[in-house]
């Protein structure tokens, strides 16, 4: 068994997958992992992320499987679960070996690895769609729009694409509290990401300073939500099924 150890990122995993083909590995005897995985008599290979190799893999995936299946693979890699790297590697290998056409990579759902990839992508995709509606932006004193989230899956980049399209002329900041990951969108310019606890400590105090208009409108919004509620029809259990408590923590109407 040959084990490729890579960092937990799209670039790291795609570089590892590129290396498996470059080294002419036997697929069934090869493992790609983001965690410390040592098996008896196995050969361990440390993978350094390579942007050029990553771009080549992305280009191949889009050409062979299409944009939709490529997005599915990326959503699967956004999962926090450690089995994602091997699942995506074996799914890609199966698709290439069987000359799978665009839009049909996930058809072989009975295959263990394809099924894993599909399940991981579905979970990440569901959370992404939830946060498109549940993320709440608030205006800071410096007029920047700010939203704090804590998703299980690493989907901030997907959300940045969505909100950059919705608010192209707004300065906004999207913060993943669980990963200390920032999505920064300057008005009228491309967005980018920053990561680190130090960055959060530098801006934390600024995110607590809301504009006068924001304070006024959030109070109006809370009042509206409480006014339209019908006490006799309250059903907390059903509400939690439709809107998980972990989303409510950062929604102004529940604060």
Annotate each language-model stretch with its function.
Residues 103-196:
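Internal, well-folded beta-alpha domain core
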Residues 12-23, 90-94, 161-165, 219-226:
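Short, hydrophobic/amphipathic alpha-helical patches that form generic packing surfaces
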Residues 71-76, 177-178, 233-240:
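Short coil/turn segments at secondary-structure boundaries
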Residues 48-53, 190-202:
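Acidic, Ser/Thr-rich peripheral helices and adjacent loops at domain boundaries
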Residues 171, 182-183, 187, 197, ...:
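Long, compositionally biased intrinsically disordered terminal regions
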Residues 31-132:
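Charged, alpha-helical interface segments at or near domain boundaries
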Residues 3-11, 43, 47, 107-110, ...:
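Short, charged/polar micro-motifs that form catalytic or ligand-binding hotspots
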Residues 1-53:
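N-terminal ordered "arm"
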């Amino acid at each position: 068994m040959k084990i490729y150890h890579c960092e937990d990122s799209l670039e790291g995993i795609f570089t590892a997958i590129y290396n498996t083909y470059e080294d002419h590995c036997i697929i069934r005897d090869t493992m790609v992992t983001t965690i410390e995985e040592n098996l008896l008599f196995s050969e361990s290979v440390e993978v350094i992320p390579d942007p050029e190799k990553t771009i080549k893999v992305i280009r191949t995936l889009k050409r062979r499987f299409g944009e939709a299946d490529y997005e599915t693979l990326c959503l699967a890699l956004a999962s926090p679960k450690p089995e994602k790297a091997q699942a995506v590697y074996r799914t890609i290998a199966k698709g290439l070996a069987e000359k799978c056409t665009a839009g049909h990579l996930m058809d072989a759902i009975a295959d263990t690895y394809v099924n894993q990839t599909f399940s991981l992508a579905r979970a990440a995709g569901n959370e992404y769609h939830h946060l498109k509606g549940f993320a709440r932006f608030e205006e800071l004193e410096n007029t920047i729009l700010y939203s704090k989230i804590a998703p299980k899956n690493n989907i901030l980049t997907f959300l940045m694409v969505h909100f950059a399209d919705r608010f192209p002329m707004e300065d906004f900041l999207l913060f993943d509290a669980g990963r200390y990951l920032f999505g920064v969108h300057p008005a009228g310019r491309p967005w980018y990401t920053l990561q680190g606890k130090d960055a959060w400590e530098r801006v934390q105090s600024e995110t607590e300073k809301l504009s006068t208009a924001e304070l006024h409108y959030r109070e109006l919004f809370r009042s509206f939500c409480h006014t339209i509620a019908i006490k006799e029809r309250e059903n907390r259990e059903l509400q939690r099924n439709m809107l998980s408590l972990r989303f409510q923590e950062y929604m102004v109407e529940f604060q």
